[in-house]
Swiss-Prot record:
Catalytic reactions on record: RNA(n) + a ribonucleoside 5'-triphosphate = RNA(n+1) + diphosphate
Localization of this protein: Plastid, Chloroplast
E.C. no: 2.7.7.6
Enzyme class: transferase
Family: Belongs to the RNA polymerase beta chain family.
Signal peptide annotation: none
Gene Ontology molecular function terms on file: DNA binding; DNA-directed RNA polymerase activity; ribonucleoside binding
Protein name: DNA-directed RNA polymerase subunit beta
Gene behind the chain: rpoB
Residues forming coiled coils: none
GO terms (BP aspect): DNA-templated transcription
Keywords (A to Z) from UniProt: Chloroplast, DNA-directed RNA polymerase, Nucleotidyltransferase, Plastid, Transcription, Transferase
Amino acid sequence: MMIIEEYTPVPNTAFDFKIPDLIEMQLSSFRIFLKKGLIEELKDFSVISNSKKNLELRFFPEKYKLKRPKYNERTSIRRASTYTCQLYVPAKLTNKRTGEIQEQDVFLGEIPLMTGRGSFIINGSSRVIVNQIVRSPGIYYKREIDKKGRKTHSATIISNRGAWLRIETDKNGLIWARIGKIRKVSIMIVFKAMGLTKNEIFDALKYPQFLKKTIQETDPYLENDIQHDDDFENESTSTLLSTREILESRFFQSKYYDLGKVGRYKINKKLQLNIPENIRVLTVQDILAAVDYLINLEFNIGTLDDIDHLKNRRVRSVGELIQNQVRVGLGRLERMIYKRMGESSPDSLTLTSLVNPKPLVGAIREFFGSSQLSQFMDQTNPLSEITHKRRLSCLGPGGLSRERAGLAVRDIHPSHYGRICPIETPEGPNAGLIGSLATHSRVNEYGFLESPFYITKNRKVIKSELPIYLAPDQEDQFKVAPGDLLLSCYSSIENNYVPVRYKQEFTTSKAEEVDYVGISPTQAISIATSLIPFLEHDDANRALMGSNMQRQAVPLLKPNRPIVGTGFEEQVALDSGTVVICRHKGIVISVDSKTILVRSLRMNAKGIQHSHIDRYYLQKYNRSNQDTCINQKPVVSQGEWVQKGDILADGSATVNGELTLGQNILVAYMPWEGYNFEDAILISEKLVYEDIYTSIHIEKYEVDARKTKLGPEKITREIPNVNDHLLRNLDDNGIVIPGARVESGDILVGKVTPKEDLDQHPEGKLLRAIFGEKARDVRDSSLRVPNGVSGTVVNVRRLTGKELPSGVIMMVHVSISQKRKIQVGDKMAGRHGNKGIISKILPRQDMPYLQDGTPVDMVLNPLGVPSRMNVGQVFECLLGLAGEYLSENYKLMPFDEMYGKETSRGLVYSKLYEARQKTGYPWLFNIQSPGKSKLFDGRTGESFDQPVTIGKAYMLKLVHLVDDKIHARSTGPYSLVTQQPLGGRAKHGGQRLGEMEVWALEGFGAAYTLQELLTIKSDDMKGRNDALNAIIKGRPIPKPGTPESFKVLIRELQSLCLDIGVYKVHKSNKNQEIDLMQNF
């Protein structure tokens, strides 16, 4: 277990409340699935009999076994396999006719195992199952008002599995039931179908007179025993019977209908019933109580439901999602077993022939491979990993679709406080549909989000007791104050009136009336947002961008701790699993780059101490899903004593166990020759030469040799018509040597493929059969380094034999490592949503410099601050400057204004003044312009007219690197139908010239440019070949011909039976038809 740093959320805390483990939600959900969920599903499927009832298959789910995985996590990643364990369940097959019994452990399939970091390894890649937030099963009441002001009410009973039941009143005061999507029937028919008498119905209702209209409408067909019209009688009887059948099959049978534990709990709570939790189907009592509540609403008694309130939305975590998939797989298996029992003779059947693991394996593989909720893990940095595991999505099966989701669903709701972060969500179509768990939030047994609060009595916040976790529906009944209240040294509330939340309203209340207080100022926000210092001074839109962009920061070669942090950096590094934690106290006996050995004393079962050596393996230059480098470095030395929970090794984006995503650099907010116009950034060449923003990226390439119709492909060094220079890095087998430096176009793996010789004569075939293959009969299909890529080969892996899919003889994986320095076109950002693209790299002697001669590292546009309202960056850079000169690092809890107005400004100014006193530099804090200083132009040595804001800002280099985006094409592939160049960098495509661009050229009258773009640069096949020849031979470019797309248009019109042709106009009025396909 990891030891979590104790954290004091409010000053003068008597009881220190720890931040919960940030990935506990994933781990506990999977644990519950293995302990309970899997057994539940196997129980529902435990007995299967054939149609004659003479053969019975029984499973014993409580005794199921999981076999130890064949390969561990590291080996699974290396072999590109899935980290799974085999599921065996004891089964008994009884032949009741002969009395024969077969018993054995049956193999049902493989279940992927969760790693200790909350992810799964599927085909060698880390994947995460995202938590889904959906409408909770239960009953919901809604009111609708038409244009004339008439009210109608409806009740919808939502199940966990099965049809929905809707009961509604109409504008005439009639009550109807709607089952699923079929036509609606009168509620009286439903009551009669359930066998209720009038007296039973009336006794259950508070206002039975409201039913009179419905009875008058329905009773002529139900009540009159003496009917004169046989047709009516038949119709009413058939309606009654069909309604009874539908109710019986859809709502009263557990095989087809399941309210779930949550649905039963919600219905019991809403309708004040005491039906046992194990009855998960609808009962007569439920429907009567639902109708009673609906009628009460007509008399303004009762409450309507807000579907966006978190009490009506629950979280489906990884365990539940896999359990649902296991149910699907077991359902398929059940049908297969039933079919086999019917088809085969009972005497010939065995357990192994009857139970096939394929249905369950297929269902689980389908979920992990293609479900919307199973996602490729974001491994850009430790923060992106942890945030991905804490994500909440409204999308996916059983959820919303982004097209249908309105504003109400996406909006922030008062019940989100302390549960879902109001800041962190994507920009674009998914805004509000994908959220992130708040720092202290947890999921209760029913799947509802809870948040912790301290109990408050008579203004005193009781911190000596553990906080109480409140669910959203419980919190509505109390007056709850936020976590950033100012408390006295005795933990009592200082102010007489405080802001509170009460019954969904944000209001003010007397301090004596407060029931609960939040445990921390950061309780309402997510982990990523709580890493932003001075968050309270940023506009929410920019804080959102800051939260999202921290997840895109690339781990750097020389990471640096932020001077100004928030205190959450250590927590994120610990819980992400990127640092190596000591499991037992002991002494370090050996340290190298790959392994750390720790000798510890342990107590065995008999109470005797014995020496034990713990071995810790470090990850070295492994590739992440986003091609960033995963590397661990030891931070302990031989002979050092370590305690349980100490950090033994740092990850690629941590320093001494603290998250480090960027660098502290000296910035100046000033314009510079227009190079920082519109968010462009000007940087010093120091950042390039000193590798301050250099990062390592590892790309993986693979090639396989297959069996073909003409013979097997071969991995070899003998490649026809290839320059020896391209083969310089290959070994004798034609595979690149690890450590080799490779450039674009170099061969990584030499491969030849047999090719068909179309002109081969029979005698030639005979000669080939006698003398064997010749070199000319194969074509070069080697794996080459793609355009724009160069680097060092760090890993080469050959796969042969059983590891490969059918038809593949050999597979080779090659990993190339690149060192990428910062360059023009790369994207950078701060933690406050202040992002930009590097526009120019200046020599350090040309950069503006401070009064002590220090050149600044980066020049930012000051106009980027006022309109964006992210003033937090200014506070951060000024405090960072003070910290640099005072050699101090700061951990600042967001929302410090609880200590008084202008607290942040006071802290920054006091630290700048302290730095001035310590260093003797009066310009560090000038009373006339605090935070600003005179700067000098590096080119001329003259001072700038106005004082400039300077400071140390923590800037990140983002994963949007120009090397991955820049693209140019001269010639390349064309589309088969239109003969126009393909689009996109991956296909080596061209630039799209859309209709708006055509309009622009037309507007300027650039006729020849336009003609050239639409013909020889696009789809005039003959014209572009002629133009290429003319360029090579230095001749004038000939006139363009007809674009291929025009020919396609004519062919399409002709295929619609329209006689369309192209004619050459003559003066003699004898027009000649031209075959475009032949002549032009």
